[in-house]
Amino acid sequence: MQIITNTLDTYTYHELADILHSYNNTAAVSDFLFFDIETTGFSARNSMCYLIGCVSLNNENFIIKQFFADNPSDCDDEKKMLTEFMHFASGFKYIVHFNGDVFDIPYLKERMYINGLPEHQFPESIDLFKKSKSLSLLFKLENYKQKTIEHFLGINRSDKSDGGELINVYKQYLTGKTLGKNVTSEYNMLLLHNHDDVCNLPFICHVLSYNQIWNEETYKSTSFSITDGYAFNNNPVKEITFSITLPCCVPKDVSYGNDLFYIKLSKNLLKLRTKIHECELKYFYTDYKNYYYLPDEDYAIHKSISSFVDKSRRIPAKA
């Protein structure tokens, strides 16, 4: 087992801080660990985890660590890798991943059990797949796979491989290493795929910035305007548009509308437009039998003061 560590310069501290603070404005960037795993199959009982990639902040530098089970002669290689990873992950408050609630975390827990390791408590989970899927009305994507989200956000990757294709590459790597062959190509291919998967997670975190629209406590300023519009029957109506300034920008404009309202989010400006319905506001008394209705004045009064009104000008209130 080996641990490969490199410094990243692909994102700035302040950019990522603004996005993560939109999720939790009291957390520090150093509280978050981004991770992704590579396995030889989907079933934890019939396969193994051979690579775990992590990105984190260390002294204002972003670091990628890749825990790689690369020793074919060591039957405890995966066990050592899992132990090192869990020790490292225990120092963080949040663990960020893509669909890890369904696959990565349950898979690792099962592999730890199979390898005879004690049960470990993972940091608080942030699943970017779930966060993206919850915004499907705004994003309107054909699916919510990681590469689809990356394309939507304008994220480019060097790796063109599929995780499933790399299973054979890993097997070729182990076989070649055992036979003393040059396996540099396979080694680089395995690390590159995991590198791009995990290094793109902070960029995918931009989806968290769209959740600002539900948190009115973060609104920096709010204004509104009233204009003329038309209902579906072409009758003129008034429309009200709220303009709300948000704390950080979103990477891509989105919008959604239906019969009741229209919403558009562009950079850090949220606009919500809806029709103003003009009608008579009514209040229903639960104890209406204790009231009289005054037809001439068109309002109700309690029986306790009805003695001051002529009987001809009042009638018992009805439900």
Question: What are the roles of these predicted feature ranges?
Answer:
Residues 1-35, 40-47, 57-60, 65, ...:
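DEDD superfamily 3′-5′ metal-dependent exonuclease/proofreading module
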Residues 52-54:
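Short beta-strand scaffold segments in enzyme catalytic cores
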